[in-house]
Design a protein with these regions (language model features):
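Short, surface-exposed, polar/charged, turn-prone segments marking secondary-structure boundaries
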Residues: 40-43, 56-59, 82-84
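Short Cys/His-centered divalent metal-binding micro-motifs
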Residues: 51-71
Length: 97
């Protein structure tokens, strides 16, 4: 486990999908980008910097393990991307990137 993935412990979810997010730092993990451009493919996770602090529910929605009936796939992806950008600011402030 890298310093970035370990840093998720106790952080707030930054993805914040409405109607999905647990809103509890106890459930926050490091959610890796699921797009191939970030290095993901065939069982390989993307690089750690291509990620976001996300609760387990938001991560499941992003990974399409849990449907989000009130949102399109593009809207879920956009929420994740916004969370990614907020997470980069946090990582920078922590000196991790």
């Amino acid at each position: 486990m890298s310093r970035i993935t370990k840093s998720a412990n106790g952080e707030d979810c930054q993805v914040r999908i409405i109607g999905v997010c647990k809103g509890d730092p106890a459930y926050t993990i490091w959610s890796h980008c699921r797009h191939g451009a970030a290095g993901k493919g065939r069982g390989i996770k993307s690089i750690d910097v291509a990620g976001a602090y996300a609760c387990t529910a938001c991560d499941a929605a992003y990974d399409q393990l849990q449907g989000v009936p009130h949102m399109s796939r593009s809207e879920v992806d956009l929420d994740w991307f916004h969370g990614h950008m907020r997470s980069l600011v946090i990582l920078t402030n922590k000196g991790l990137i």
